[in-house]
């Protein structure tokens, strides 16, 4: 029969708005079979021996976009690849999805291939792909339920293997994998994990919890078992602990509340220097606005309290943080329109002009990505 061929074509890679580019580069291919070492032309066809894989060993600075059939075969066998090639595939797929060259739905089968991965970087990257999908189910309850279920399933074997507690002589890889797996189990509302997380929180002082999983333990207790006295206790510890790490863990946890009254209390504390120091205020704000249930509350607060932000941070290089952080979290078309409208009069301030323009671009890109891929992602989650 005829010798199979593979055609390689190069073009400049962009995410978001851009001017077209016809630049050509000499590209070292690092292929899995003898092709040219370097691709210098726009397009070239080679005889191929089976599927071509490029950038083996993650040596090149380029993104590889395979045709759908090759991509699917590659995903199927991805668990057998060398570690760096797994990382390459995961990184490229994320970038291709963000740029609109691949559907974000393709992140799902690729992530699930690495369920039994022992390398921490690969396991983490695959888990991060599942996290990337959360923005697509922001307003779909059925989609969220499926993503939670899939996230817990993905992490369960790894977590059962490693257990809750660090073993003597355990590798850094195992420590990192435990944290990633537990995070996915708790997002997935695994009932055994939630029962244990509650027990540990009730029986141990927050500062005595193991540092690696402490933020996850406190966070899950606020998210799923919140009681008013818990909030009081954590605010008190926050104000009195000498540990900056514990303060960050408490801020991350309190802001994950599902209770609007607690969110309002946090926003009041942001304006009270006796509770939250001004230099930490924007950190609390970003954690809060990134929590699905609190995004609108935090955004409304920013609009209503802008004069306080200006009075407090106007002369400081952190002044634009609140705008930048809001832009990193907003994700619906209504939120984009509202952000644009609110920031329009602020653009006249030189300290804010660039941040506002970048923010509008960032939200618009996210909205376009969600509108483009949402149906396909929800469909992939169903199957």
Tell what function each PLM region has.
Residues 1-7, 16-21, 33-383:
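Long, ordered, helix-rich scaffold segments
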Residues 10:
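Short beta-strand/turn micro-motifs composed of small residues
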Residues 26-32:
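Extended low-complexity, serine/threonine- and proline-enriched intrinsically disordered segments
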């Amino acid at each position: 029969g005829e010798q199979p061929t593979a055609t390689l074509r190069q073009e400049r890679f962009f995410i978001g708005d851009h001017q077209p580019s016809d630049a050509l580069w000499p590209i070292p291919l690092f292929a899995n079979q003898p092709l040219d070492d370097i691709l210098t032309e726009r397009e070239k066809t080679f005889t191929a021996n089976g599927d071509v894989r490029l950038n083996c060993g993650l040596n090149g600075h380029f993104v590889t976009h395979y045709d759908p059939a090759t991509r699917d075969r590659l995903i199927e066998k991805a668990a057998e690849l060398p570690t760096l090639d797994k990382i390459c595939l995961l990184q490229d797929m994320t970038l291709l999805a963000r740029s609109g060259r691949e559907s974000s739905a393709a992140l799902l089968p690729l992530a699930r291939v690495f369920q039994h991965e022992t390398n921490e970087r690969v396991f983490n990257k695959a888990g991060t792909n599942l996290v990337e999908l959360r923005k697509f189910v922001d307003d779909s309850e059925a989609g969220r339920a499926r993503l939670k279920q899939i996230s817990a399933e993905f992490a369960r074997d790894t977590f059962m293997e490693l257990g809750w507690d660090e073993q003597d002589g355990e590798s850094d890889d195992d420590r990192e994998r435990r944290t990633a797996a537990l995070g996915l189990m708790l997002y997935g509302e695994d009932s055994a994990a939630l029962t244990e997380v509650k027990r540990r929180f009730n029986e141990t002082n927050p500062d005595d919890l193991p540092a690696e999983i402490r933020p996850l333990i406190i966070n899950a207790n606020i998210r799923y078992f919140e009681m008013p006295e818990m909030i009081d206790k954590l605010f008190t510890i926050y104000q009195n602990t000498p540990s900056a790490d514990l303060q960050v863990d408490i801020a991350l946890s309190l802001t994950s509340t599902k209770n609007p009254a607690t969110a309002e209390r946090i926003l009041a504390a942001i304006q009270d220097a006796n509770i939250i120091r001004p230099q930490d205020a924007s950190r609390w704000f970003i954690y809060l606005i990134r929590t699905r249930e609190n995004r609108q509350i935090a955004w409304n607060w920013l609009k209503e309290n802008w004069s306080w932000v200006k009075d407090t941070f106007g002369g400081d290089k952190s002044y634009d943080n609140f705008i930048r952080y809001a832009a990193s979290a907003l994700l619906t078309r209504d939120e984009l329109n509202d952000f644009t409208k609110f920031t329009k009069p602020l653009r006249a301030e030189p300290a804010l002009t660039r941040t506002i323009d970048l923010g509008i671009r960032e939200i618009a890109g996210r909205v376009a990505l969600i509108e483009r891929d949402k149906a396909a992602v929800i469909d992939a989650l169903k199957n």
